[in-house]
């Protein structure tokens, strides 16, 4: 028995191994065709089929369609004329709800999209964010296919902003447009998203503007002309508003005959513009008027002597413009002081400067001796080129160059009172640089 059992054991193992061997797999059945490609007889019948193969194919198709990426139901889709259009169907041509969708599915999608855009109808989706483009412009380039909310009462509400006098939007809740504050212009116009405050309280038509004060003239009309021209009047100067400060022109459009013209003093320093000896001329106060020679005439009888004859024509009355420049620069105590304003008393940015401009400007103590005209004397420094050429310096006591007391620059213009004009010309002619004019 034991030998027989030992002899039959390998046979049992062999049978078990042969029974456990895997069988080759059967080929998978081909996928069933979609319902749209079924025969007409099967599609036309409304009764459910009891064929197991048909039921299996139907279930496989539903499983494939529902497990896909979009889980879309194939057509046809219901047409419901009284309902709004299905936006997903208009965009993609498919609908995951199939025949159970409660929206309209028009056959011609392009025609439906075009008609919706013509009517200006946009979808209202309460749970979605609002379409920002629709809020700004009142339109939407996506039309009914846009996935955002389009409230009808807010159409273009973001674009309805108030404009300032220059046509730029006023947005107090936004930051100020830096480019507009510097230049007074904005290339984006009324579409800029920043704030554009008013630069002026009044335009050029306003006479009480703090930036452009009113101009008063002491004479409104000149004497009648002896020729064929009738009596003429001097026109009032017109000023163009600008974000920067502009000094009004001191020259009015007029016809000036040969003679002397009385203009306001050009001296901006505390002292005399051109110091001369007390024996030849009198010192003038800073507010006194000075004579401006329009032409130098050489007398024919005294031409060989090299002397310039005095002016024979009487002084011609010219309108005097009294300008009172107020402090138009902004005071910002919480900002640092404008260094240019503290040095010169002026600021090219005017009312739009972002720094502080105190009314009482503390002048720094000069570190050198000042000349009679209020300019610094720095013997060891380089000569101020602007002062050597024109006799003035816009930096005043703050200039870092030397301003020695010197004779005025030689030219056709001479400054001084009417009584001291001839002695001044004599002194200029005696200088070596005037030899060319006397030869």
Curated annotation (Swiss-Prot):
GO molecular function annotations of the record: DNA binding; mRNA binding; zinc ion binding
InterPro entries per the UniProt record, alphabetical: Plant_ZF_CCCH, Znf_CCCH, Znf_CCCH_sf
Mapped zinc finger ranges (C3H1-type): 80-108, 125-153, 171-199, 332-360, 378-406
Subcellular location: Nucleus
Extent of Low complexity compositional bias: 7-21
Keyword Transport appears in the UniProt entry: no
Protein origin, superkingdom: Eukaryota
Compositionally biased tracts (Pro residues): 22-37
Gene3D superfamilies hit by this protein: 2.30.30.1190, Zinc finger, CCCH-type (4.10.1000.10)
Subcellular location, principal: nucleus
Location of region: Disordered: 1-52, 277-306
Keywords, ordered alphabetically: DNA-binding, Metal-binding, Nucleus, Repeat, Zinc, Zinc-finger
A Gene Ontology cellular-component term: nucleus
Protein name: Zinc finger CCCH domain-containing protein 12
Organism: Oryza sativa subsp. japonica (Rice)
């Amino acid at each position: 028995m034991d030998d027989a059992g030992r002899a039959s054991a390998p046979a049992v193992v062999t049978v078990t191994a042969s029974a456990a061997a895997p069988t080759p797999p059967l080929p998978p059945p081909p996928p069933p065709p979609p319902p749209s490609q079924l025969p007409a007889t099967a599609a036309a019948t409304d009764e459910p089929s009891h064929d197991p193969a048909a039921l299996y194919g139907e279930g496989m198709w539903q499983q494939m369609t529902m497990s896909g990426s979009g889980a879309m139901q194939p057509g046809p889709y219901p047409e419901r004329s009284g309902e709004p259009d299905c936006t997903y169907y208009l965009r993609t041509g498919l609908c995951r709800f199939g025949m159970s969708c409660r929206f309209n599915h028009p056959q011609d999608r392009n025609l439906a999209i075009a008609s919706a855009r013509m009517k200006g109808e946009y979808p209202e989706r309460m749970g979605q964010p609002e379409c920002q483009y629709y809020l700004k412009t009142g339109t939407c380039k996506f039309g009914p296919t846009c996935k955002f909310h389009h409230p009808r009462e807010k159409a273009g509400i973001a674009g309805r902003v108030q404009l300032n006098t220059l046509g730029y939007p006023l947005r107090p809740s936004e930051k100020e447009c830096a480019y507009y504050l510097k230049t007074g212009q904005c290339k984006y116009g009324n579409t800029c998203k920043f704030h554009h405050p008013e630069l002026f309280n009044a335009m050029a038509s306003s006479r009480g503007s703090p930036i452009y004060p009113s101009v008063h003239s002491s004479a409104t009309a000149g004497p009648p002309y002896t020729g064929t021209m009738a009596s003429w009047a001097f026109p009032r100067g017109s000023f163009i508003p600008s974000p920067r400060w502009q000094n009004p022109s001191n020259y009015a459009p007029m016809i000036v005959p040969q003679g002397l013209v009385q203009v306001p003093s050009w001296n901006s320093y505390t002292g005399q513009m051109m110091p001369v000896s007390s024996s030849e001329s009198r010192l003038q106060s800073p507010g006194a008027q000075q004579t401006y020679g329009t032409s130098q005439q050489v007398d024919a009888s005294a031409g060989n002597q090299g002397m310039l004859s005095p002016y024979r024509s009487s002084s011609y009355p010219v309108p005097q413009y009294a300008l009172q420049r107020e402090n138009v620069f902004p005071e910002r105590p919480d900002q640092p002081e404008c260094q240019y304003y503290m040095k010169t008393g002026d600021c090219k940015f005017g009312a739009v400067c972002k720094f502080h401009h105190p009314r009482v400007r503390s002048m720094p103590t000069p570190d050198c001796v000042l000349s009679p005209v209020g300019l610094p004397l720095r013997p060891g420094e380089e000569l101020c080129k602007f002062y050597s050429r024109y006799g003035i310096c816009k930096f005043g006591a703050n200039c870092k160059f030397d301003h020695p007391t010197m004779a005025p620059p030689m030219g056709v213009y001479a400054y001084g009172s009417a009584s001291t004009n001839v002695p001044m010309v004599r002194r200029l002619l005696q200088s070596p640089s005037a030899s060319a004019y006397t030869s």
